């Protein structure tokens, strides 16, 4: 496989950007080697500058649920662009997308569009603190909620790959207001509430963890977190930046029957354009400026092209589309598990809907500690062999892979065939 142009571009990029990239996980630090520079994408495939063709399971880290360059999405975005790329004023497209969100998630009684998932989560935290008059928040070890200072405490994803439990530059006075507990461990969360309940403004969680690899909630865990929040007067914030409109038309909240006080969105809601949102209970959201005193603002919030992209993508995600995604994802997970068994490589294939992770472990992976115990060297060998055979997976053991409605049975078959060869390579690594 040719990589000469990617290598040359990476050399130039290292002179221009920290680590040669504009987001850490893209640098292949977790697996080694040279990141591929992508020139174009179509459907379920991406193509690099050297002409290599890959079945894409990164999908821009989740947003491309209908695949790349879907004609309906492209048409609606092009129509919006002809009208103007940004107004700094309200537009009808904001209402079209918001009404579609609330139709599918009626618990989102009011919402605010922002420009990223990080902006959504940090805004939700501010709103929770302002609404409750409390300062502390609780997050779960290994859950990643964006790059805001209050949430870079025991975060997963790229922070995990770098081996940093926290990021330098986060003041201790900020971090001390972020309490943590192990994911899937209700007794541990109860202890946190017993110790600090009167000062806790909110608990924020990924309902299905995606930034430690896919961690599946144990039965009763999510509802238990909700109930503890109710008992102690804290807000229950569900971070659906990754899961929203991906796991079902109602996201993870719809799938698991949750009713959050606040919910955050990103990724799918913008179909690949920069966008985020937070929303929830009417009485909570009515405290947000200009209706209330809790300040939040953004120059590009509600950008018309992002609104158009999200609206087009969500309209395409019918119940039939979700059924197709489930069938394809189940077939891929089963094929990967079988290929690993053939190679006698112990793995755990964790999956919820169209999110999955192959963990190189002989034990169940259900929290940050069990994820960190995985064999990242074997994952690195597996990743590079898959890349060589045309399957583009997330370049980290601690990330989720995604499928789209553009993926086909042939894509899955090609990927499983590549996995048979890749697991054989991984078996050679101790």
Curated annotation (Swiss-Prot):
Any GO BP: protoporphyrinogen IX biosynthetic process
Reaction equations catalysed: (S)-4-amino-5-oxopentanoate = 5-aminolevulinate
Pfam families: Aminotran_3
Sequence positions bearing N6-(pyridoxal phosphate)lysine: 267
Matches recorded under InterPro entries: 4pyrrol_synth_GluAld_NH2Trfase (IPR004639), Aminotrans_3 (IPR005814), Aminotrans_3_PPA_site (IPR049704), PyrdxlP-dep_Trfase (IPR015424), PyrdxlP-dep_Trfase_major (IPR015421), PyrdxlP-dep_Trfase_small (IPR015422)
Pathway(s) of this molecule: Porphyrin-containing compound metabolism; protoporphyrin-IX biosynthesis; 5-aminolevulinate from L-glutamyl-tRNA(Glu): step 2/2
Disulfide bridge positions per record: none
Domain of life: Bacteria
Tagged with keyword Cytoplasm: yes
Principal location listed in the UniProt entry: cytoplasm
SUPFAM superfamilies linked: PLP-dependent transferases
EC id: 5.4.3.8
Keyword field: Cytoplasm, Isomerase, Porphyrin biosynthesis, Pyridoxal phosphate
GO cellular component terms given for this protein: cytoplasm
The protein's required cofactors: pyridoxal 5'-phosphate
Gene3D superfamilies from the UniProt entry: Aspartate Aminotransferase, domain 1, Type I PLP-dependent aspartate aminotransferase-like (Major domain)
Gene Ontology molecular functions: glutamate-1-semialdehyde 2,1-aminomutase activity; pyridoxal phosphate binding; transaminase activity
Intracellular or extracellular location(s): Cytoplasm
EC top class named in words: isomerase
Assembly and oligomerization: Homodimer.
Family: Belongs to the class-III pyridoxal-phosphate-dependent aminotransferase family. HemL subfamily.
Name this protein carries in UniProt: Glutamate-1-semialdehyde 2,1-aminomutase
Organism the protein comes from: Anaeromyxobacter sp. (strain K)
Lineage per the UniProt record: Bacteria, Pseudomonadati, Myxococcota, Myxococcia, Myxococcales
Underlying gene: hemL
């Amino acid at each position: 496989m040719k990589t000469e142009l990617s290598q040359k571009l990476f050399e130039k990029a290292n002179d221009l950007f920290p680590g040669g990239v504009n987001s850490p996980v893209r640098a292949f630090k977790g697996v080694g080697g040279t990141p591929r520079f992508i020139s174009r994408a179509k459907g379920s495939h991406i193509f690099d500058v050297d002409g290599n063709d890959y079945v894409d399971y990164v999908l821009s880290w989740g947003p491309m649920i209908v695949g790349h360059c879907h004609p309906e999405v492209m048409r609606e975005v092009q129509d919006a662009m002809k009208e103007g790329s940004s107004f700094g004023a309200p537009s009808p497209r904001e209402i079209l997308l918001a009404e579609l969100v609330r139709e599918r998630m009626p618990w989102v009684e009011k919402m605010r569009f922002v420009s990223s998932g990080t902006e959504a989560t940090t805004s939700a935290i501010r709103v929770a603190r302002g609404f409750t008059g409390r300062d502390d928040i609780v997050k779960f070890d290994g859950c990643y909620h964006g790059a805001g200072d209050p949430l870079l405490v025991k975060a997963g994803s790229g922070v995990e790959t770098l081996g940093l439990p926290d990021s330098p530059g986060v003041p201790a006075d900020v971090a001390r207001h972020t309490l943590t507990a192990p994911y899937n461990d209700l007794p541990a969360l109860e202890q946190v509430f017993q110790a600090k309940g009167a000062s806790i403004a909110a608990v924020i969680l990924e309902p299905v963890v995606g930034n430690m690899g896919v961690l599946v909630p144990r039965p009763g865990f999510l509802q238990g977190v909700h109930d503890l929040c109710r008992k102690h007067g804290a807000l229950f914030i569900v971070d659906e930046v990754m899961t929203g409109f991906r796991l079902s038309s109602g996201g993870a909240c719809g799938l698991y029957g949750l009713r959050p006080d606040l919910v955050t969105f990103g990724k799918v809601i913008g179909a690949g354009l920069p966008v985020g949102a937070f929303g929830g209970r009417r009485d909570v959201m009515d405290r947000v400026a200009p209706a209330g005193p809790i300040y939040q603002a953004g120059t590009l919030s509600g950008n018309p092209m992002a609104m158009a992209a999200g609206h087009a993508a969500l309209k395409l995600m019918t119940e039939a589309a979700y059924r197709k995604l489930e069938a394809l994802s189940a077939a891929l997970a089963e094929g990967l598990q079988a290929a690993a068994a053939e190679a006698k490589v112990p793995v755990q294939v964790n999956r919820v809907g169209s999110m999955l992770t192959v963990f190189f472990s002989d034990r169940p992976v259900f929290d940050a500690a069990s994820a960190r115990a995985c064999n990242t060297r074997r994952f690195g060998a597996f990743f590079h062999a898959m890349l060589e055979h045309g399957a583009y997976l997330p370049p980290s053991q601690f990330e989720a892979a995604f499928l789209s409605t553009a993926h086909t049975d042939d894509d899955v078959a090609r990927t499983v065939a590549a996995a048979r060869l890749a697991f054989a390579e991984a078996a050679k690594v101790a």
